[in-house]
Structure formats: structure tokens, C-alpha cells
């Protein structure tokens, strides 16, 4: 009985690990779909979001190919009171020393004992903050995170739900099959910008490999041209700025990259204090300075001057290179406005006027040290609010999926990923500009099966236990056979002696 109990428990563990949630097929389409639901305004940031709190619950998920995944919060709030509350939903990626914000949305007037949704929250919902990074986009379906994972998206995802004054934190560990033989290439993901990021060991392709696994609807580019950011559930000024924020905690040696403070009156930001952004690429001039090379002996000729102009730089010239940013100077960024006061629960019969939180991306970025103790910051201070045109906002962008005025899915993701993989990749690093050349390498010497470590470990344990049971049964059978053989021998001896 004890062995049976252990085997049953291990079987349930394996089932829990293997069960994965692929996004419903109705979310896979590449054309805009309108309905009557509209966000009521920008997020108020009245409920603090702390991704550093201890987890209340954990879960696992496993993705393969170009699937659209729907990560559900592994949290249960059914024991709460059903009284209406405002709810904030925020998803993060655990980057180790920092928690990378992915999406953020507020719901108003929601039942306190259920997950928020646009159907059940009578006060409406806010614009959605979403991160676009390294060919990957994220979206919310009510409280669940939608993404199309690549090899660099494997890791721990954090969800924070704030119901009134009560905060809940859950984690989902996502594993991704290590196989490149898919239309989307699989070489994308959030951690690809990390220094020294490398591909995991790639498993060989099996004979029954389903290469076209995933979401690949046809895309109507013309239908997306007139779609506004507000229709996607995003702020109206979404496409006008790219502002980088990140939330770090570990110690006061860590830094926060955020909006640069406004320069004091009478002072100007110097070039040494400014950091390059991607908009400076077109205004970069490279000049070689230092002592001019000695002219060659003899009279100068037109051919000689032409040869000097065509002369290539050598390694000795590297110490004499200056990079100068030319063009009109950029005005310093203005300080962001303070977050508005905590809102009251909203109803359909009340009008609310909201100003748009706008960050100026033209100012320089500076490094600011955190205080020794971790502090709460508003989501507007830790989220990436990127630029983009409607044609590049992939199918499941923003707040559109099955819960917003315009339903967008991951349908366009595969197409844009394939197109983007043919272009040079510009990688933004926090606090400055980093150019990276991607070298594609494939490791075919490994025999990894592509299963996650938890799955393999559970299977190995079950197989080992089953083997022990079989060995025990065999030993018992042999023991009984030996006893019977001895009994027969004793009987023969007794008959012979008689």
C-alpha cells in the first residue's frame, strides 16, 4: 500500500508538470476585430506593485515550436469576499538581479473573489502598458499572459495581483523545447540581449516532428494601417516615445535606469553626461585626430593625394579616433508628473477625465542609485513603453486579445519574426546603446530530448520505482520457487527413507 501511494503521488506530479496551456485557437487570427469595449483611461498607479515579495503559489508550463502560450496566474482568490474592489495585474520576467516588467493593467469594480476580466469588472479597465523587446511582444487576456516563446524566453515569470489592499504573487516556470526546426526559428526571446547569451543544447529533430506547430494566420496589413493605439487598449501617445525603466533591488550598488531628472536652472546637460540612443545613429561622425602623417618625399601629385585619401585606417589609428554626435542638441527630459491619487471604484454612469502620462525620450539617461532598502515604485516608473507603428504591432499586442475593443493575436508574430531575422538586429542596452552582431551556431552533438528537467526527473523516478517493484516481484517469485523445491526434495527423502 505504501508503494502504491508513492507511485500515485509521483504520477500526479508528472501530470501536473506535463500539463500545459496552449492559447485557444480563437485567439489565432491576423486581422483586427472590433467590439464595444474601450479602456477608460491611463493607469492611475494607485496600487503599489512589488515583484520582490515572496511567492504565494507556483506553477509550470512547457512550450514547443511557435505556439502561442497562455500563462495563467497560479493563484486562488475564491476565499476572498465578493465585495467589489479595484484590481491591478502585472507580469514580470525574473532576470535574477532585476525583475523585468512585461505587461500592466488596472481593472475597476471587480468581484473580490474572482480573477478580473473585462466582462465582470463593471468599472472598466485602464490602458495597458506592454513591453516590446527583441522581436517579442506580450499581451493580457484578463489576468493571463500571452506570448509566443522562443528559446530565450525560458525562465521564471512572476505575476502580481493586487485586490484592493491585498497583494498576491505567483510564479510560472516556463520551459521551451530546444529545437530550431520551426518556421519562427526559435532564436528569439527576452534574454537574448544579455551579455554572453548562448543557445541551449539543441536536441536532434525526431522523425515525427511537427514542424508547423503554432499559430500562422494570414495577415491583412491594410486593415492594420488605420488602427490607433487607443483601439489596441494602449495610451494615445504610445507610438511617440521609447522610455526604458527597470526595477532592481538587491543592494544599493544596483542602479535604476529611468527618466533623467530635469537639469537645474542655469545648467545644461553636457555631452559627457549624455548617453547615445538609437536616434543618434544617423548623426554619428568618426574623425581621426592627432599628429598628421609625414608627407612622402618628393613633390605632391594628384595621384599621391588620391592615394592618401584612399588609405585605410590601421590599428595604430584606433587610439586617435573620436566619435562625435552632430546635429541639433536635444533638450533635457522633463520630470514625469507624480502619480494621481488613489481612485474610487468606477461605475458606468460616471465620467472621468485622465491626463496621459508621457515620457520624453529625447533627454539623456542617467544612473540613479537605489536606497539601501527596496522601495515600492509606481508601475509607470518600471515599465517599458515602446514605440511602434500599427503595421509592426504584432497580432497579440497590447490589450486586444479577447478582452479589449480590438482583438489582436500572435498571428502576425511568426511573419514578423521571419522578416526581422533577415535584417540586422539592433540591441538596446539599458543606459546606453549597444550594437550586436548575432552569430548563428547549431550544436548537433547532444542527445538531449527537449524535455524539461522536472519532467525528465519525474519520469526517471517513476521508471526507477517501477523497476524496483518488478525486481521485488521477481525476488519473491524466486524465493517461493526455492521454498517449493526444498519441500519437494524433503518429500523425496522421506519416501526414500521409508
Curated annotation (Swiss-Prot):
Region feature 2 X 22 AA repeats of E-E-[DE]-[AE]-E-L-T-S-S-D-L-D-N-I-E-I-E-V-V-G-S-P, mapped onto this chain: 271-329
Skewed-composition ranges (Pro residues): 329-342
Ranges of biased composition (kind: Basic and acidic residues): 346-364
Positions bearing carbohydrate: 56, 86, 142, 226, 443
Transmembrane residue ranges: 463-483
Membrane topology classification: Single-pass type I membrane protein
UniProt feature, compositional bias: Acidic residues: 308-322
Chain spans, region Disordered: 290-377
Positions with biased composition (Low complexity): 292-301
UniProt xrefs under Gene3D superfamilies: 2.70.230.10
Subcellular location, principal: virion
Repeat (Sequence) residue spans along the chain: 271-292, 308-329
Endpoints of the signal sequence: 1-20
Protein origin, superkingdom: Viruses
Keywords: Glycoprotein, Host-virus interaction, Inhibition of host chemokines by virus, Membrane, Repeat, Signal, Transmembrane, Transmembrane helix, Viral envelope protein, Viral immunoevasion, Virion
Cell location: Virion membrane
Family designation: Belongs to the alphaherpesvirinae glycoprotein G family.
Function: Chemokine-binding protein that inhibits neutrophils' chemotaxis.
Official protein name in the record: Envelope glycoprotein G
Species this protein is from: Suid herpesvirus 1 (strain Rice) (SuHV-1)
Amino acid at each position: 500500500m505504501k508503494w502504491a501511494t508513492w507511485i500515485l503521488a509521483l504520477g500526479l506530479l508528472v501530470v501536473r508538470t506535463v500539463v500545459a496551456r496552449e492559447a485557444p485557437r480563437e485567439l489565432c487570427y491576423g486581422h483586427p476585430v472590433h467590439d464595444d469595449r474601450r479602456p477608460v483611461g491611463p493607469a492611475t498607479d494607485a496600487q503599489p506593485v512589488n515583484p520582490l515579495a515572496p511567492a504565494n503559489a507556483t506553477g509550470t508550463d512547457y512550450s514547443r515550436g511557435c505556439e502561442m502560450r497562455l500563462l495563467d496566474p497560479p493563484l486562488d482568490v475564491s476565499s476572498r469576499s465578493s465585495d467589489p474592489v479595484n484590481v491591478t495585474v502585472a507580469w514580470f520576467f525574473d532576470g535574477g538581479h532585476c525583475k523585468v516588467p512585461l505587461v500592466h493593467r488596472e481593472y475597476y469594480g471587480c468581484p473580490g473573489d474572482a480573477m478580473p476580466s473585462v466582462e465582470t469588472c463593471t468599472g472598466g479597465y485602464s490602458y495597458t502598458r506592454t513591453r516590446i523587446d527583441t522581436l517579442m511582444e506580450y499581451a493580457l487576456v484578463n489576468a493571463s499572459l500571452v506570448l509566443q516563446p522562443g528559446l530565450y524566453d525560458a525562465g521564471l515569470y512572476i505575476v502580481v495581483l493586487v485586490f484592493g489592499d491585498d497583494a498576491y504573487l505567483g510564479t510560472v516556470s516556463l520551459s521551451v523545447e530546444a529545437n530550431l526546426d520551426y518556421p519562427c526559428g526559435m532564436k528569439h526571446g527576452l534574454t537574448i540581449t544579455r551579455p554572453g547569451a548562448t543557445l541551449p543544447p539543441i536536441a536532434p529533430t525526431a522523425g515525427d516532428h511537427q514542424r508547423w506547430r503554432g499559430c500562422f494566420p494570414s495577415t491583412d496589413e491594410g486593415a492594420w494601417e488605420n488602427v490607433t493605439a487607443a483601439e489596441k487598449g494602449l495610451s494615445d501617445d504610445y507610438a511617440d516615445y521609447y522610455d526604458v525603466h527597470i526595477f532592481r533591488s538587491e543592494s544599493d550598488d544596483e542602479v535604476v535606469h529611468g527618466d533623467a531628472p530635469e537639469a537645474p536652472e542655469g545648467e545644461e546637460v553636457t555631452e559627457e553626461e549624455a548617453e547615445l540612443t538609437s536616434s543618434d545613429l544617423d548623426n554619428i561622425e568618426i574623425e581621426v585626430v592627432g599628429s598628421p602623417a609625414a608627407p612622402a618625399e618628393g613633390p605632391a601629385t594628384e595621384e599621391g593625394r588620391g592615394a592618401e585619401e584612399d588609405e585605410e585606417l590601421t590599428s595604430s589609428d584606433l587610439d586617435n579616433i573620436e566619435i562625435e554626435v552632430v546635429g541639433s542638441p536635444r533638450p533635457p527630459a522633463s520630470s514625469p508628473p507624480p502619480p494621481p491619487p488613489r481612485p474610487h471604484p468606477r461605475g458606468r454612469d460616471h465620467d472621468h477625465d485622465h491626463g496621459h502620462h508621457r515620457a520624453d525620450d529625447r533627454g539623456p539617461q542617467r544612473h540613479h542609485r537605489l536606497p539601501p532598502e527596496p522601495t515600492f515604485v509606481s508601475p509607470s516608473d518600471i515599465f517599458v513603453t515602446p514605440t511602434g507603428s500599427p503595421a509592426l504591432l504584432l497580432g497579440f499586442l497590447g490589450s486586444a486579445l479577447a478582452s479589449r475593443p480590438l482583438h489582436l493575436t500572435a498571428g502576425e508574430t511568426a511573419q514578423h519574426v521571419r522578416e526581422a531575422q533577415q535584417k540586422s538586429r539592433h540591441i538596446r542596452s539599458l543606459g546606453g546603446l549597444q550594437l550586436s552582431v548575432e552569430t548563428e551556431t547549431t550544436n548537433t552533438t547532444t542527445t538531449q530530448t527537449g524535455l524539461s528537467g522536472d519532467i525528465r526527473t519525474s519520469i526517471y523516478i517513476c521508471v526507477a520505482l517501477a523497476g524496483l517493484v518488478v525486481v521485488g516481484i521477481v525476488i519473491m517469485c524466486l524465493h517461493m520457487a526455492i521454498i517449493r523445491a526444498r519441500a519437494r526434495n524433503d518429500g523425496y527423502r522421506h519416501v526414500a527413507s521409508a
